[in-house]
From Swiss-Prot:
Site (Transition state stabilizer): 67
Lineage per the UniProt record: Bacteria, Bacillati, Mycoplasmatota, Mycoplasmoidales, Metamycoplasmataceae
Cofactor: binding details: Binds 1 Mg(2+) ion per subunit.
Catalytic activity reported: Endonucleolytic cleavage at a junction such as a reciprocal single-stranded crossover between two homologous DNA duplexes (Holliday junction)
A single GO cellular-component term on record: cytoplasm
Residues annotated to bind Mg(2+): 50, 52, 65, 83
Sorted UniProt keywords: Cytoplasm, DNA damage, DNA recombination, DNA repair, Endonuclease, Hydrolase, Magnesium, Metal-binding, Nuclease
Organism this protein belongs to: Mycoplasmopsis pulmonis (strain UAB CTIP)
Name this polypeptide is given: Holliday junction resolvase RecU
NCBIfam families in alphabetical order: PRK02234.1-2
Pfam families, A to Z: RecU
Length: 157
């Protein structure tokens, strides 16, 4: 996969999945717009963006950050402190905050609760640690990753 387009496949799959959920009234999700600095007008955005996606399912607020990576490790520098803190605040207030990973080499999707990253002392997390601490979910026809069963299981615990 070309580095320039890293994350585009994951974003497309997630967008198709949430469109399916929204269309079938199973849940309500949206991709948050990423603020950009205008080169022509010189407008500067002062507030940092929080996470990629927000939504609601069965009365529970949900927020997640989508990350693609390749190789044996995911560098935690790809997660900004304010993003992780935001997800943890969501969890503190009885919502659900998590990470949606795509490992490009294996072409596999993983969902991991944000709290699983809390006490890491290294600057990266190995694919083996992700496999141990996350749930792998499959891509199904027509390009949908059905993550609602995982969300439901976390809500019901």
């Amino acid at each position: 996969m070309i580095k320039k387009n890293r994350g585009m496949f994951l974003e497309k799959v997630i967008n198709q999945s949430i469109d399916f959920y929204n269309l079938n009234d199973l849940a309500l999700f949206e991709k948050k717009a990423t603020p950009k600095v205008s080169k022509t007008s010189g407008v500067i955005i002062h507030k940092k963006s929080t996470v990629d996606y927000i939504g609601i399912y069965q009365g529970i607020f949900i927020a997640f950050e989508a990350k693609s990576f390749s190789g044996k490790n995911f560098s935690l520098s790809n997660i900004k402190n304010h993003q992780h803190e935001y997800l943890e605040k969501i969890n503190k207030h009885k919502g659900l905050g998590f990470y949606f990973f795509f490992h490009e080499d294996e072409e596999k999707f993983y969902l991991m609760e944000s709290k699983k990253l809390n006490n890491l002392t290294k600057k990266s997390i190995s694919i083996e640690q992700i496999k141990k601490n996350a749930l792998q979910i499959e891509l199904s026809f027509p390009g949908i990753v059905d993550f609602l069963p995982w969300v439901k299981s976390l809500i019901n615990n």
